[in-house]
Amino acid sequence: MKYDAGRIDVAVIGAGHAGIEAGLASARLGCKTEVFTINLDWVGNMPCNPSIGGTSKGHLVREIDALGGEMGLAADANTLQMRMLNLGKGPAVHSPRAQIDRRAYSAYMKRTLEEQENLTLRQAEIVDIYYDSGEWVLTTRLEAVYRAKCVVLATGTFLGGRVYIGDVSYESGPDGMFPATELSKSLKALGLPLRRFKTGTPARVNRRSVETEKLEPQFGDEDIVPFSFTGRYEVKNTRECYVTYTGEETKKVILSNLHRSPLYSGKIDGVGPRYCPSIEDKIVRFSEKERHQIFIEPCGAETQEMYLQGLSSSLPEDVQLEFLHTIPGLEHCEVMRTAYAIEYDCIDPLALKRSLEFNDFDGLFGAGQFNGSSGYEEAAAQGLIAGINAARKVQKKSALELDRASSYIGTLIDDLVTKGCSDPYRMMTSRSEYRLLLRQDNADRRLTPIGYELGLISQERYDAFCRKLELIEDEKRRAENTTIHACKELNDILVSRETSPIDGGIRLSELLRRPQADYKLLAPFDPTRPDYPKEVFEQVEIDIKYEGYIKRQQAQVDEMRRLEVKKIPQDIDYAALGGLRLEAVEKLSKIRPENVGQASRISGVSPADISVLLIHLERENRKHDK
């Protein structure tokens, strides 16, 4: 028998990476929040790679931290190995990545949710949802009925989940958990635009059966940069990763058994991730390649499980064993968990606003893989924004909408709600037009003032941030006013780095503009240098060295924002606008962009269509001014 379980401000369905950030943000902003999960023991689970960060994903984690989210802190507290990727390239693409103790990370996040004021964490499966009299009504499997002002759907791969391993398939969530089958039916009945996507995960092997002496070890960085700008946790490297490669025998085994793959036999209907293909997909698509790189990574400090990055598969279990045993170092490996593919329901993100609220469902928000994205970091970023905006809607405040020039978070959301996605969306640095401005090292300078204004950044943390800004400006002035004097030692170093020697004296800032010079190189010749934190000098050096490029990108941002401020009425009838092409009418009517800048980024909307739209808006503005 159904019973009334009470009223809440914000209900979050799912306690994965999106649900955690949504629940914490909502509660920290003062809303009575309830987070529902199918299993309390799997809060913040990592069903695939036990890592946080990576190229562009590390940018997202630092942005989450800069806004006041939790992922960066949780990762720092549970890191096994930390590396900064792409150090051989420019600072725009430097990206932190950490190997994580997945069980410890989960326990950290569960404890954080349990201890958060205004938040209740509950093990319960939501099986029905509908809108009634200005509230969302949620019913659990045990017939408890909750009423919520706003709901965040953060269902991950649980929604209608089905696992595939060769000829075997069955209803399941990730890691053998129950799927959310009834909720999927309820959302379809509600009218949400659901579709099927697919993802997969590799096998896990017992470390004791891996011949590590045959593998190439990979160590963490000596100079560690944590995810969190707070520096709350001391991050240490305690485990190694390893590298190996597939070979010709691996390829033969997979190709001879391709007919047994559900991916190639037509059993899987869902669309898989373009940038994270299975090993059988890689063998077929890149047939000319002789080998594929495999990373063997620890899953935790208290387990022998090792994760095989690059070997995602849905081939039968016996075939998996056969091809694993062809790989150097894995010839005698024991599989602890079999690789699988999982198909699940998600939405078309074109149904969402930039606030991540549905266009047609008041107070209903989506986040994470439910929105068609892939990855823990993409999920957490969306969860943070959805949680913030659900809370702000309850409090009758305007939504937080980050634009493309503010953050990778803004780029991610804009891509999803403006362009949509035909396969699981993955963040990449190449997706941003402004990546020199959106570096991982300056995420706090871009976003911490916003987090403070929202109420997610403490006064103590904000004061420390403001002090950092003061030091950056002080050092810039010093660099402009400090003269570095010529000497044989300095000129020998400059010549060895293939840059011209100096005569007499030169300003420190002028030397720093040279690609071959940096603060570390110039330390012996800069006796007045103050004892500031290294991140202060890092920011000053980048600002000086890339000043011209930064100014050019900022001019592009100013032009983009000129169009972003031109709002489009949501009740506009595009079909009534003379001059718009039919494709533009269809796309604009479906997506309903909130401003001209967003409209200009829609595939199928031309510059000529934007001109027609601008003329119409200007005409309407003149009418209102009279």
Summary of predicted features, one role per range:
Residues R141-C150:
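Core beta-strand elements of the Rossmann-like FAD/NAD(P) dinucleotide-binding domain
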Residues G6, L24-Y131, L142, A154-P174, ...:
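Conserved N-terminal/central alpha/beta ligand/cofactor-binding core
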Residues N39, K57, K185-L321, T418-N491, ...:
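An anion/pyrophosphate-binding glycine-rich loop and adjacent beta-alpha core
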Residues Y307-S373, E401-D414, P533-K587, R592:
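A glycine-rich dinucleotide-binding beta-alpha-beta segment and adjacent secondary-structure elements
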